[in-house]
Amino acid sequence: KNEKILPLSIKKKVIWAGPYTASREFLSRWSIFGEHESVETIEEVLQKKQIEAECITGCNILSDAECKVWQVEQELSDKPRDEQWLETITQEDTVVCVLGEHESQSGEAASRAFLTLPEEQQVLFEKIAERTRNIVTVVIAGRPLDLRRISEKSKAVIMAWRPGTMGAEAIVDIVYGRINPSGKLSVSIPWCVGQVPISYWDVKTGHILTEDNSENRFTSRYMDIPNTPLYPFGYGLSYTEFDISDIDVQIGQDKKVHVHCNVCNTGNVAGAEVVQCYYETL
């Protein structure tokens, strides 16, 4: 999501908030031999790039109670958690919230019934949202989360997943426009947990919901939420725009389908586009 707030100017006053501004927990559960000591924090990257910004952790990744559930030790921040800084935020300020689940909350033996952010982070986000609408939220996670509230209250959302050793630098470069994002979602982000499992390849059978029968109660639908996900498989934004034209589809003698097209960058920023092709049986 980007409501014309990104990329940010390095001259703009920006507050980076959230426990992941000072955390090195950017590796995934499968990086058995990964060394967290080799991971730079977002705060360190901002200093290295000489970008003036205030960094506030605000809370821990997990509460004490959540640490017991997920069988991890509390990683107490060495930075003060004085909430007076919240009172200094005005409607004109821009806050980049870097939030997400703990690395122990995804991967093997980490099933979850609720896909919201950890409790303390939800509270922190709501307090910030009370002060300003200019919020960019970067989500660190190893699975699709319930991000509806985050999306409603943020002008931009970046799904960073668990970005690895150089993740902090990539996040900072994207936020300030030093690189142009081109990634597309490899999963669907659900509108709420009640939609799970949700997939773009689901075969819809009888009583299919269409534009023509949207008022018909007796269709394959949810009555209280949309059928569509919050962000669908293959979705992703860029700081530029692309035009895909001259699409040609041929079936070769080898019985393979060959697709050709022209891709033109029609914007003012260099970038890359992922051309996606979908087919279905009729």
Give the role of each language-model region.
Residues 1-43, 47-49, 56, 62-69, ...:
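Secreted, periplasmic, or luminal enzymes acting at the cell surface/secretory milieu
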Residues 25-28, 99-119:
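Glycine/threonine-rich flexible loop motifs
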Residues 41, 84-87, 120-130, 244:
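Alpha-helical scaffolding segments of alpha/beta enzyme cores, especially the outer helices
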Residues 51, 130-135, 153-155:
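A short helix->loop->beta-strand "cap" motif at the edges of active sites that frequently abuts
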Residues 64-80:
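Charged, often glycine-rich, active-site loop that binds/positions anionic groups
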Residues 92:
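An anion/phosphate-binding loop that grips the pyrophosphate of nucleotide cofactors and donors
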Residues 121-125, 135, 157, 171:
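Extended, hydrophobic alpha-helical segments in both membrane/secreted and soluble proteins
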